[in-house]
From Swiss-Prot:
This protein's name: Small ribosomal subunit protein uS14
Assembly description: Part of the 30S ribosomal subunit. Contacts proteins S3 and S10.
An example molecular function term from Gene Ontology annotations: rRNA binding
GO cellular component, one term: small ribosomal subunit
Role played: Binds 16S rRNA, required for the assembly of 30S particles and may also be responsible for determining the conformation of the 16S rRNA at the A site.
Single biological process term from Gene Ontology: translation
Coiled-coil portions: none
Domain of life: Bacteria
SUPFAM superfamilies xrefs: Glucocorticoid receptor-like (DNA-binding domain)
Family per similarity comment: Belongs to the universal ribosomal protein uS14 family.
Signal peptide annotation: none
Entry keyword rRNA-binding: yes
The keyword RNA-binding appears for this protein: yes
Length: 101
């Protein structure tokens, strides 16, 4: 199981990204708008740089909802490969069966 501090750090990043998402999108739209002057676009870039680093969605990492494991996480289920296998073998995920051909 991942350390609790790492799991909490990821939750903090998710909250920050949600909090600043509208402002971030507006600033990026301003920066990419070719009709505005260079000064306005540069000022928007400076404002974007003033936002917290953890407010960027790029810094987020998917983690297993059960264990907090950062690697091998299936997006569709939000679970790590190990826990997904355990839960699927118990039959707790509808429609998921072991492959055989």
């Amino acid at each position: 199981m991942a350390r609790l501090a790492l799991i909490n750090r990821e939750e903090k990043r998710v909250k920050l990204a949600e909090k600043f998402s509208a402002k971030r999108e507006a600033l990026i739209a301003t920066i990419n708008n070719q009709n505005l002057s260079e000064e306005e676009r540069f000022a928007a870039r400076l404002q974007l740089q003033q936002l917290p680093r953890n407010a960027s969605p790029v810094r987020q990492r998917r983690r297993c909802a059960v264990t907090g494991r950062p690697r091998g996480v299936f997006r569709k289920f939000g679970l790590g490969r190990n826990k997904l296998r355990e839960i699927a073998m118990k039959g707790e995920i509808p429609g998921v069966v072991k492959a055989s051909w």
